[in-house]
Amino acid sequence: MGDAATLALGALTAVQTGCAIDLDTDHTGPNAPSVGPLRTTPRVAWVLGSGGPRGFVHVGVLKALSELGLKPDLIVGASVGALVGTLFAGGLRANEIERLALELQPALLLRWQPGSSERFSGAGIASFVNQQLDGQRLQALPIAMVCVVQRLRDGVVQGFNQGDTGLAVQAAAAIEGQFTPVRIRGERFADADLRMPLPVRLARSLGATRVLAVDTSAHEERRPAGADRYATSDTRKRALTRPDAELADVLLHPEFGYWASVSTEYRQRVIAAGYAATMAQAAALKALHAT
């Protein structure tokens, strides 16, 4: 099922609420997602990368960071990193997010409603996020949040930080070829994974001087026999990730195995890997957040 499986939290709501699918609505109202100034200049930013089912690792990272008593000024998230990061920025505790992640029944994925070209609508993701956060707008979340998207017309990467929170996450998680792009003010937006899967440079451009980045890409050196067909994809992802990874002050690249899955066992293992990798860097992380 690939990257689409990572967005199962939103799919769960789509199934439960029976939300309608509107494949090409142009969102033009005053609450449509947009780019605007942050409330304050951030010092510490957490950057949560894209990564398909491996993105469950973010849940474990946030759980560990919470136990360490650490908090960012800004969270910048790509794809599943936008989904998990937004829930946390909106006030959900890490253990609540973990519960949601583990309660997912993968069979529900089979009930997603297909759109054009055998793609799925991400409308359930928007509904889910807005329900969980009581309709808070992005600019009003307790922690400043940026949902990273690419504008399909020209591939420009930008970060929504104002407007409809759920719709911004839907756009950030609209995996090309699998989910219908989100149309906002005449432009089509989608997941930025093919442009900037670990948006550290974007966090820096917003003023962050200290950056923790969570890389969820595969460990190429541990590619097992039989996985050669994924070599090109792995190399592409590594090439896109490297320029940003090198700019992070603390980089977490948890060891979660090569093969990805949406099984409960896999989710538990990946969350645990994120937690362990974070705790292993506790001293460096505390120093990063020190005044």
Tell me the role of every PLM-derived stretch.
Residues G77, G81:
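Gly/Ala-rich beta-loop-alpha elbow adjacent to hydrolase catalytic centers
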Residues V84:
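Catalytic DNA-binding helix-loop module of base-excision-repair DNA glycosylases/AP lyases
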Residues D3-I75, L87-T291:
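Patatin-like phospholipase
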